Swiss-Prot record:
Expressed by the venom duct. This is Conotoxin VnMSGL-0123. Belongs to the conotoxin O3 superfamily. Residues 21-44 form a propeptide. It is found in: Secreted.
Amino acid sequence: MSGLGIMVLTLLLLVSMATSHQDGGGKQATQRDAINVRRRRSITRREVVTEECEEYCKEQNKTCCGLTNGRPRCVGVCFG
């Protein structure tokens, strides 16, 4: 293979590596944004929790994450 052919293949390889690396950064940013949204939702939802719900879930050694269909939703950890 000629020197020019090797240079072209090397350039294509470098370009593909650079673009895949940029895509990975975009995915990380998207995941980070999704985590931030979940955190905000769980904080907002915690404000709606009533004392009755907290007491009911405390008996089960769980955390009250709000009401679902009028009934307390008790889980180990609240996620948005």
